Every structure is written in C-alpha cells, then in structure tokens.
Amino acid sequence: AELGADGVDVLHVQMDNETPEYLRFLRERAENRGVELICLSIHQDFVDPNKDTRDRNIDHTIHCIELAKELGISYIRLNSGRWNTTSSFDQLMADRGIEPILPGFTEDDGFDWCIGSIKECLPAAEKAGVVLALENHWGLTRTPEGLLRIVNAIDSPWLGALMDTGNFLEDPYDKLEQIAAQTVFVQAKTYYGGGEWYTLDLDYPRIAQILEKNDYQGYISLEFEGKEDPNTGVPKSLRSLRKAFGQ
C-alpha cells in the first residue's frame, strides 16, 4: 500500500507458511491496508512422462486452489511446465526459452499431459470459484500457439490465459494480440535499472490499446524485474502503468 498499489499478487513460494493463522493474518493485513489480494501465483509442472509426478503437481495445484479460496483470491497463475532438458534457468534464458524435447517423446505428448492434468484441476477450481490463468511462460506456453492450444482444447470458463507482457521475446505485440481475447489476468513487467536476464522496452500504451480492443477489464499486476531499488522502481512502474492504462 505504501508503494501505491491497489492490490497484491501473492507468490506462493514466498508465503511464510500455510497455517490458518497466517492466512488470516494476510487477509486482515490486506484489508487494513486497503488493498485486495488479487492472484495467487503458483508453480507446477505438468510436462513429465511420469504419471506419479504429474499427479503430485495436480494435487499441489488443487491444494493451492483451496488456499486461494481461503485468502479470498479469485485467480491462480498456472504454468504448463517444460521439458527440463536444460539444466539451469540461466541457460534457458540464454537460449531464449527454447529447449529440446525429452528424448523418446513428442511435443504432442507434452500437450496431452498438460491438458489432461489441468482438466483434473477444474472441478476444484469451479467449486472454489477460482479461475485458473495459464501464463505465457517458458515451456509449452512459450508461444501464443502453444498457450491457445491448451486453453482452446479445454474450453472451460474456469481456465483462461494470463498475459505476461515480458515473456514473448520477439514480436511481442503481435503475439500479445493473439492471446488477448482469452486473457483473464495480466502481469506487466518493467525493468528499471535493467533486467536480470533481459530487458524489454515495452510500449504500454500500445499494450493497453490491445487489451481495450479485446474488452479486457481485469487486473494489471506489476511484475517488477528491474535491478533498481524497488522502493523507487515500483512506484515509478506503477505511475507508468497507470498513465498507460488511464487509471
């Protein structure tokens, strides 16, 4: 709240714990500060030939859906997962997010695993009233075609696209426009001070026009990835986004 935000996108791995007392503390702290808890961003990986591994990721996702419900959060950031044939994230970024398919399998296998896994999470999402927002992240959703292949195959009101403005490294505006109609949540990257792996000079007025054209009326969540001190970088980013989106 002190930095000028209206809401908080909670990163699950940064939560201190998951006790009822801690969840109540987060809810009350947000309410007392006049901010809304808007999304629970979680990590899972459905791109694995081992069914037991996929089942553990399904269970984790369903567990996080229940956490979101307890926190009064309406959206969960979902990942498709990736092949994990690249040993480090630094190397993956050096390779522009592209990695080889696991030997002995095909891209279709990965999509089948991911689609089947997300389908198993949907009853819990519907029961909790929590929308799953699949991010254009690394792995199967690195391209708009990959993201839309999953969302369109499932075709559920409880699954949509999460537009991360900084994850299409080439021709971003054309690709963002391709997923805009399916977008239910937006994470907007800024890079003041330079990014950790890369820096994009994003035209946010242009992105705002893309979203407006597709009647997007949801949240714009700042994802600050710059090296500048967040005490100055975050307020600067929020001012820039408010100006671009007319808020």
Regions found by a protein language model. Give the residues of each.
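Metal-dependent catalytic neighborhoods of phosphoester/phosphodiester hydrolases
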Residues: 18-24, 50-57, 230-234
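Active-site-proximal loop/turn and secondary-structure-junction residues that shape catalytic pockets
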Residues: 12-14, 44-46, 80-84, 138-140, ...
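Glycine-rich, proline-tolerant flexible connector loops at the mouths of alpha/beta enzymes
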Residues: 9-27, 82-87
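Active-site acidic/histidine proton-transfer and metal-coordination neighborhood
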Residues: 29-36, 47-160
